[in-house]
Amino acid sequence: MTKRALISVSDKSGIIDFAKELKNLGWDIISTGGTKVALDNAGVETIAIDDVTGFPEMMDGRVKTLHPNIHGGLLARRDVDSHLQAAKDNNIELIDLVVVNLYPFKETILRPDVTYDLAVENIDIGGPSMLRSAAKNHASVTVVVDPADYATVLGELADAGQTTFETRQRLAAKVFRHIAAYDALIAEYFTAQVGEAKPEKLTITYDLKQAMRYGENPQQDADFYQKALPTDYSIASAKQLNGKELSFNNIRDVDAAIRIIRDFKDRPTVVALKHMNPCGIGQADDIETAWDYAYEADPVSIFGGIVVLNREVDAATAKKMHPIFLEIIIAPSYSEEALAILTNKKKNLRILELPFDAQAASEVEAEYTGVVGGLLVQNQDVVAENPSDWQVVTDRQPTEQEATALEFAWKAIKYVKSNGIIITNDHMTLGLGAGQTNRVGSVKIAIEQAKDHLDGAVLASDAFFPFADNIEEVAAAGVKAIIQPGGSVRDQDSIDAANKHGLTMIFTGVRHFRH
């Protein structure tokens, strides 16, 4: 009995050669619509789908393969006599191979001019149905959704006249993943259209971007997946211009770096980062000076660190960066001379280019945190804060220089691991206490790091001070201005201590925990 294949693809890459080889192996080919036209034009004889169903395509192609003659031919178990008899009684011929890929829904909704009606029309119905039927019956039917599998299937058919069960099972698994991802994109699109913020089912889909050598530690396996609907301002979309492949820890650090730099749009700014904590932030009227400040903030910790700049890297800045051992540099662009300088004898230095003009769109994405047995979902900590809404709670008002420095410090503290304390002036960080289990410990670490640069410095805390002992430490160090959320039941104790020492203190009313 001649074996039959059903071919209906939107991605026609490789399909002509594949179909010709099938014909050479003695297969009959059923086809539909544009695929049939393409095969016929290439000289590949095909059977029209309506010759199989006895029913014409209708409703602009919405109904053409949803028919018992198709699904019966796919679902009939070859090892069950009653199935074969039912097929015979109803003149259903068996289909042994299905090659289908789906309407380009993803590509359609990514078009800037897409309309709702166009998106709906690109939801495939018949394709997923055929794929599911064939994949369910993979004991007998080979199903192909990816052109990358054409060669394997043809090779096995040529060698043995059929594919192996292991191949059919693997291809079926790929099909179910493909359909699930396709449906997840449709669900994501419609969920966004109706503005559903808390869906009862969360369906998200990601594509494998990079198989990694290992994870956070060598004993951990890891891979990097990219959102199926890409985010332009993201590590997944960054263009790598030089260097080794990014590691698991590199990717997490870069993600933290490009989040931090989003908050410093107004002036040229450089952020140096280690282990997802900023170790130096500098801003100035030009990017070279901003680099100087970021480097001077902590010339020890920057060694082996990540650096992100929010302006084009010029030659002067590149010359200063080149002697420093850095893991990664990220910027919106690089001058030709700067790139030549940075890559000179630095084949391992990872240099990334990222479209900073797409930052705003990245801020609306949800954050996902895996826990054992579940997933936490929250929006990003990107609340718009207006300094005019902040409250000076002490007798002394901040000076103009202090006010500028406090605003700078408040931007920086958002990205320090809690309990987080940062000491800055109006253009660079000076000391940082991160990740301590008590706040006064973070205060002491930040003061120790900044001890030679405390004149005119200010201090920011990511959460309220629970006790006045923190204020006492700050005052003893000579810091004269503090910014914090407030909200402790002992706020008045802290205010009294600040007044006693002549400090100025601002309450923002917004906490910035970062675990």
Swiss-Prot record:
Catalyzed reactions per annotation: (6R)-10-formyltetrahydrofolate + 5-amino-1-(5-phospho-beta-D-ribosyl)imidazole-4-carboxamide = 5-formamido-1-(5-phospho-D-ribosyl)imidazole-4-carboxamide + (6S)-5,6,7,8-tetrahydrofolate; IMP + H2O = 5-formamido-1-(5-phospho-D-ribosyl)imidazole-4-carboxamide
SMART domains listed in its UniProt record: AICARFT_IMPCHas (SM00798), MGS (SM00851)
Keyword Transferase recorded: yes
Entry keyword Transferase: yes
GO BP: 'de novo' IMP biosynthetic process
NCBIfam families listed in its UniProt record: PRK00881.1, purH
Name under which the protein is recorded: Bifunctional purine biosynthesis protein PurH
Domain MGS-like as annotated: residue spans: 1-145
Originating gene: purH
Known EC number: 2.1.2.3, 3.5.4.10
GO molecular function terms noted in the UniProt entry: IMP cyclohydrolase activity; phosphoribosylaminoimidazolecarboxamide formyltransferase activity
